Structure formats: structure tokens, C-alpha cells
Curated annotation (Swiss-Prot):
This is Probable alpha-L-arabinofuranosidase B. One of its GO terms (molecular function) is alpha-L-arabinofuranosidase activity. Residues 19-335 are annotated as: Catalytic. Gene3D superfamilies: 2.60.120.200, 2.80.10.50. Its EC number is 3.2.1.55. Glycans are attached at N83, N202.
Length: 499
């Protein structure tokens, strides 16, 4: 129970000027790690929120709040990243403990980047506004992960802790494991009870809840728990708001899952009670590393979007968490625009011309299922003109963006598969829709448009050896070469050869 002094302090901390970590501090459960690319989580914080690295010259810079306690300076990012690409290389810890999150190393599973590291996130995949001010979240595709295996002050063993994260309830999958929280220091699976992390997704391999998901669950290692029992727990609802508050806490023989809409309303308790009655979970053996977007053993097949989150020392009360939720709602998260520069109109038919010098007579076309570039002009055959013409439709996975249907093969769309662009029939699956959705942005070379993958925002339409790929600006694939990248990912939008 709170003393009168702490109740008064909590009431003061819940004012608009306070941040989530001020509220936890007033509740005697201070933040030991605080991460956000969108805003300061303390009213007095004015330091760096995150670090960017741009693709043009690999220079880095840091992004801070516009004012102490305020929203991130998105304009500084936009200026730094103009006409190139940017990755988020560090998410800084605001607590003062130095628990920064950096590119996750290999562990039980290798990542897809150099030397088995996980990928870094695009800086522009999750635009939002907070109280009308632009900011960017962390859109994490499969293979993306951040970690700190040498964290300070985080709970170990059976010590009590709490945590929350603001996540996107529309961006998820059923792979392991989109987590934020406490994990192993070795990046390997060291056994049941060695983790305590928030999970959001629709995996049913271990635990699951009511409906089709996604669900907030707790990753305690070797199991995702949605309640007291392994497997199904009806008290854990599907939660698919654009902005989800997920709150988890654990102590000696107790733990809880709470959640709600981060844009309105209060938190609900989905489970609060004793630890799971299975070997390894009571007492717990937490190790104190911090992960984001991955499992404790570096399982990296999951996807999701992270906006802010903290970890605390001590088991926060429901009252404290309720006040934090009020603060989050007061931040007024709203989804931002995924589109910039010249755009498209759903229903129009276009041809897309290469702008790379020496290749400007070539257009995006297809030969059977292979998407490529071919020389096309008014004297070309009707067949080739149709193969180089595309009907623009509203994005199959996101209505802000677009999908491209073949004129000569109705019902088939450009999609990425293993980062090659293919023409495949729409099979109606969530995976296909995500693979076939692309967001136009201001062209990186100033000509036409650049088309960014919605599901892998580090990757763009790129012609390479006359074949189309979803390519990044530098990377492990041959077609990720930085040479001529800006030209190769920029295409002029022209009247279609055929309709």
C-alpha cells in the first residue's frame, strides 16, 4: 500500500509535465532502463534519444527532444537523412544507467547481417505524431533486433521488476519473438525462467489467448504465458489497436499482464496471480540483459513496432501503472504519413522508367514471374507494352501505400520474396499482402519516385543487372551494393504503354 506521502507524490507526478519515469519514481519503483525514439520519458530529460547512421557517407548523428521532457526533433532527422537512407544504430537509455540498445549479436540463432548480427531498423518506417509533433518509432522487420547483454540495475534471479512498452497492434506475426524486456546475458537459451519480457504477436506455439490475436504475453523462456496455465488462457484478449500499451510485472511467486489502448482509456488486467506451476518458473532465474524485437536466444523471425518502453526496479502497483497509462494517452499518439514526394492514385495505370544514366530507355516489366527492366518504346510489341504496364491499387497491407497489379495478368502483383521482386497471384494471405505493399517517397536522386517496401522499410525497388530486387543501401546481398543506389531506386512515373 502507498503511504499518504507517496500518494501525494504520485498525484503530482501524474500531471501533464511529468514523464512515465517520474511517475514510477514517485511510486518507489524507479526506471532502470528507459527507451524511446519518440519522446523523453522524464520531464527533465534533454539528452540523446537515439543515434542515426546515414547511407550516403556512414556519418552518425543523435536525435534529442525539441525541449526537455518533449517530443523528438524529427526535423533534425529529416534534414540529416535527406536524399539518402538512415538506420537507427543506438536507442539510448534515458535512466542514466547506460543501458543503451545496440545491434543484437548472434546467439543461439544468427542474424542476417554481417557476422551473424541482426539487422538495424530503418529510421522512417513508423512515422507518428505526438500532440501534433512529428516523430518516428522503430519499425522492426523479421531479422531486426537490438540488445544489451551488460545492463546495469535490471532485475536478476527472482528480484521484482516491472515494464511497459507502447507497440503497434497492427504490425505483428506468429514467429518468435517480438519481445521487450529481461533476457539472457549470453544470447542463448539457458532454461525456463531465465527471461521476463513483454511479447506481442499471434504465435500459438506456446501460449495464446482469446480470438485470433495478437496477444500480450510474457516470454519467460521456453514458454510464452498468456495466464496461469500453459497454452490457452481465455482471459488474455486479442488486442489490435494502432497503439497498444503492454505492461508486465513479476516478483516472488507473482506476476501480471495488463494492457490497453495507448491512445485512449485505461489499462485492464488480463492476469494477476501466482507464477506458472511448471519447473523453472518459481523461483525465477532472470539474468538482466535487455532485448528488443527478438527472443532471448536471438530468435529473430518476429516483426513489430516499438515506440517507447521502460523497465523498473521493484514491482509497480496498479495505481502507478494506471498513472503511466494516463501519461501515455496524454501524449496523443497518432499514425503519421508513410508517403512523401510524388505519389500515385489508386486505379491509375502507369509505366515506371529507370533513371540511372545509361539505362533510361528501360522500364519495369516482367517475364513470366520475374520482374525485370526491358527497353520499351512506342514501337514495341503489344505484349511487351502490357508487360511494362501496372495498375495501381490501394496497398494490400496498408491503405496509405500501394500495390502494383499486372495489366496483362490481372490478379497478380509485384511482391518481394527472398528480396527478389516477383509477379505472383494474390493468395489472400497476410504474408502476401505485406510482401506486395510499397510506399512511395521523394526520389533519392531527385527524379520521379522511390518505392519503399512497407514490410521491410530499409528495402526499395531496385534494378540490378536488369532484374528488380527489394534492396537496401549496403548489405550482405550483391544487389545491396551502395554503388549507384540512389539512381537505381528512383523511377519516373509515366503514362502507361497499355491499359
Amino acid at each position: 500500500m502507498f503511504s499518504r506521502r507517496n500518494l501525494v507524490a504520485l498525484g503530482l507526478a501524474a500531471t501533464v509535465s511529468a514523464g512515465p519515469c517520474d511517475i514510477y519514481e514517485a511510486g518507489d519503483t524507479p526506471c532502470v532502463a528507459a527507451h524511446s525514439t519518440t519522446r523523453a520519458l522524464y520531464s527533465s530529460f534533454s539528452g540523446a534519444l537515439y543515434q542515426l547512421q546515414r547511407g550516403s557517407d556512414d556519418t552518425t548523428t543523435t536525435i534529442s527532444p525539441l525541449t526537455a521532457g518533449g517530443v523528438a526533433d524529427a526535423s533534425a532527422q529529416d534534414t540529416f537523412c535527406a536524399n539518402t537512407t538512415c538506420l537507427i544504430t543506438i536507442i539510448y537509455d534515458q535512466s542514466g544507467n547506460g543501458n543503451h540498445l545496440t545491434q543484437a549479436p548472434p546467439g543461439g540463432f544468427d542474424g542476417p547481417d554481417v557476422d551473424g548480427y541482426d539487422n538495424l531498423a530503418s529510421a522512417i518506417g513508423a512515422p507518428v505524431t505526438l500532440n501534433g509533433q512529428k516523430a518516428y518509432g522503430v519499425f522492426m522487420s523479421p531479422g531486426t533486433g537490438y540488445r544489451n547483454n551488460e545492463a546495469t540495475g535490471t532485475a536478476t534471479g527472482d528480484e521484482p521488476e516491472g515494464m511497459y512498452a507502447v507497440l503497434d497492434g497492427t504490425h505483428y506475426n506468429d514467429a518468435c519473438c517480438f519481445d521487450y524486456g529481461n533476457a539472457e546475458t549470453s544470447s542463448t537459451d539457458t532454461g525456463a525462467g531465465h527471461m521476463e519480457a513483454i511479447y506481442l504477436g499471434n504465435s500459438t506455439t506456446w501460449g495464446y489467448g482469446a480470438g485470433d490475436g495478437p496477444w500480450i504475453m510474457v516470454d519467460m523462456e521456453n514458454n510464452l504465458f498468456s495466464g496461469a496455465d500453459e497454452g490457452y488462457n481465455s482471459g488474455d484478449p486479442s488486442i489490435s489497436y494502432s497503439f497498444v500499451t503492454a505492461a508486465v510485472k513479476g516478483g516472488a511467486d507473482k506476476w501480471a499482464i495488463r494492457g490497453g489502448n495507448a491512445a485512449s482509456g485505461s489499462l485492464s488486467t488480463y492476469y494477476s496471480g501466482a507464477r506458472p506451476d511448471y519447473s523453472g518458473y518459481n523461483p525465477m532465474s532472470k539474468e538482466g540483459a535487455i532485448i528488443l524485437g527478438i527472443g532471448g536466444d536471438n530468435s529473430n523471425g518476429a516483426q513489430g513496432t516499438f515506440y517507447e518502453g521502460v523497465m523498473t526496479s521493484g514491482y509497480p502497483s496498479d495505481d502507478v501503472e494506471n498513472s503511466v497509462q494516463e501519461n501515455i494517452v496524454a501524449a496523443k499518439y497518432v499514425s503519421g504519413s508513410l508517403v512523401s514526394g510524388p505519389s500515385f492514385t489508386s486505379g491509375e495505370v502507369v509505366s515506371l522508367r529507370v533513371t540511372t544514366p545509361g539505362y533510361t530507355t528501360r522500364y519495369i516489366a516482367h517475364t513470366d514471374t520475374t520482374v525485370n527492366t526491358q527497353v520499351v518504346d512506342d514501337d514495341s510489341s503489344t505484349t511487351l507494352k502490357e508487360e511494362a504496364s501496372w495498375t495501381v491499387v490501394t496497398g494490400l497491407a496498408n491503405s496509405q501505400c500501394f500495390s502494383f497489379e499486372s495489366v496483362d495478368t490481372p490478379g497478380s502483383y509485384i511482391r518481394h520474396y527472398n528480396f527478389e521482386l516477383l509477379l505472383n497471384a494474390n493468395d489472400g494471405t497476410k504474408q502476401f499482402h505485406e510482401d506486395a505493399t510499397f510506399c512511395p517517397q521523394a526520389p533519392l536522386n531527385g527524379e520521379g519516385t522511390s518505392l519503399r517496401s512497407w514490410s521491410y522499410p530499409t528495402r526499395y525497388f531496385r534494378h540490378y543487372d536488369n532484374v528488380l530486387y527489394a534492396a537496401s543501401n549496403g548489405g550482405v546481398q550483391t544487389f545491396d551494393s551502395k554503388t549507384s543506389f540512389n539512381n537505381d531506386v528512383s523511377f519516373e512515373i509515366e503514362t502507361a504503354f497499355a491499359s
